[in-house]
Amino acid sequence: MKVEGFSQFGTTERTAGAIRNILDYEGVVAPHTREPFTEALLMGIGGGLGAEYATWAFTPIDPSRPRKAKLYLRFHHVKNYIDKNEESLLPKIANRLGVTLTVKETASKDRANEFLLESLKSGKPVITSLSVWHSQYMRREVKEQYIQDPNFFPLLLYDEHVSFLPYFTLPYPWINHNLTIIYGFEEESNQVLLTDSSTKPHTLTIPQFNLSRGIIKSRKNTGLVLDPPSKITNLHQAVRAGIHDCVESLLHEKSVVSGANLRVETWNAIAKTLANPTAKRGWLTLFNEGWQLFDTLTRLHAQITFHNSDGGALRSSYSDFLQEASDILKKPQLCKIANQFANIGIMWDDLSVEALPDDTPQLQAARRTAQEWNALFKIHGEAAKKRLDAAAMKIQTIRAEVSETFPLTEKELIALFQDMSTRFAEIYEAEKIALKALKNLL
């Protein structure tokens, strides 16, 4: 079963991109341009920007190994899970545009696939979430599958983790799950047809799809179908609501979004602790081994530049949104604030380069190889699998090398973290100024 004529592939911000692609497939256009919606506009309608930061410490499977600390940053407003929670990003965007959502949650993969087939038969693509990397030991069915057939998974084993998506082999620390559109489920050929951030389509076998979708039990094999109106009539209100969400959550004394730290003050908190050698959550304390430092710096770079972003920690995309909003709301003053966010995006990109600097050959090579992987994946998808695997293996090799001997001395590392702290502080001040200007204008 396949949705005929579906050819909308590729995303940057995955949630906004999935909605854009389905609206485009359904023939729904933005009323102010009479062209397909842009990702930037949809992202802004959903609340735009966020500022979440966490460092998590995990006990490894092997008790003889030290606890693992991992860095997490989120730059978009609220979480991009697919569920019934109206405060999640996808329902928020859809509700503001008058798009009806049908959400199916079930613990049964068979019932989930029945919903998928029924939706595809009626001409509706289905949005779902797939795990990318997970520990093979964390779920019994994963371990059993791996024992039966190690070749079921792609070639990379990364720090006791396996990749569930054969086409996605970029190392684990950078991404955990993908929001995807399923537009085909063909039982005779044992294929699931889906989209990703690449501009090319992808395929999984049905067992690969079932395992990847079901590995995180709380997601409940969720499938989601959009039923948009033929015409969007409330764009003005949707844009204003999105800007209000962004400003209020980032400038509020305490986060107005339950369970998430979304305040711009987050960046100032990082600036104060990152290079502090006595701080409990300082990076010198948390990430004190070569592999931890490498994972942290590469993850910081990836999340700013290409994981769910096309650079600038989504601030560049928000600049594009404000440019569109100035036309929709008839407020040309928004263009000036858009320019502020464009400059902030450049500041974030500079920070991402600072994390993997040119004057340290191994870190520079990791940065350039990750950029190469991302460009290949975006443009060529599965057709570039050999080159994608080679790039991923190169990053693995660099990680192994720096785990033995990190290329920066303690003094050089302290200097690097101090420079990064300064950049976080400068970003904090710049974002606060831009957000206050936005609040005063609207």
Give the ranges of each region predicted by the language model.
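Noncatalytic regulatory segments and standalone regulatory/sensor domains
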Residues: 159-162, 166-169, 173-174, 186-313
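Hydrophobic, glycine-enriched assembly/anchoring segments
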Residues: 418-442
